[in-house]
Amino acid sequence: MKKLLVFVFILALLGSCSKKGCNDPLAKNYDSSVKKDDGTCLYSILGDWELQTYILNGDDLTTTFSDYIVHLYSDSSYLAEYLMLGDSIYINTRGTFTLNDSHTELSYENTEINYNDGNGWNPAIVTYTYSVNALTYETLNMSLISTDVPNVSSVEVIMSKI
């Protein structure tokens, strides 16, 4: 009888353990059988993102933009459209991006820029690698790891999905 009680107790204990993982249906790695979210949800970076915060070399430059939107496409290309405060003509950049499998590092390679001044797209090769501090369904928060842009030592960016 004691063995049966011990066996039933062990079964009850094991059966009461909740499965951990990602229980957010908006995440790429959603698991409907998960009872307790353990913070491992991975979200798609694809879509349209609007700038919320831009800190360059310690200076908050967010308000220097009237508009700043980045479109990230499924073929790993992107298009950035931004309008400086007081200007009436958008500047566009395009290139490619890579997000690593663990969603901790995002790299951009700018390939072209268009000042929309009648001269069309011009080569502009620039690379940025960011540490992804947070990527949710609605928010992207990242910090610069490296770039080949002279005089840029730090960048903090927060964007919201639109």
Model-based region annotation:
Residues 65:
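A short beta-loop-beta micro-motif enriched in histidine and acidic residues
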Residues 7-12:
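Bacterial N-terminal signal peptides
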Residues 14-16:
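C-terminal motif of bacterial Sec signal peptides marking the signal peptidase cleavage site
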Residues 5-6, 18-50, 57, 69, ...:
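Primarily marks secretory-pathway-exposed extracellular/lumenal segments that are disulfide-
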Residues 71-76:
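Secondary-structure capping and domain/repeat boundary segments
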Residues 56-60, 77-143:
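Contiguous, well-ordered beta-strand patches that form the walls/edges
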